[in-house]
């Protein structure tokens, strides 16, 4: 159900102009479909696809110990992300389970930007 409190991504008007079917997803108005699933699948396989990720959570981690901190909470090797690079990794909870998965972007100079799922943004922080 769409709520008046749902937020719009910067691409919302473009989605509407392309006749997207819009749904509410964790407080965001997002496109779920434009044409048929088969037509969209074939277009993605033979041409290109675009996914609006504006709704995802963005968390900045910065400082001299930022890499060491991230290395402790993620299962993948953070050092694989050279400046300007990205590592994808599960994020561990305190008991060792999976809290979320995230992209860790190395912004350089002891600064990282985590891209986490919209539904888990508050629990990650």
Task: Set out the residue ranges of the language-model regions.
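Basic, glycine/lysine-rich polyanion-binding surfaces/domains
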Residues: 1-125
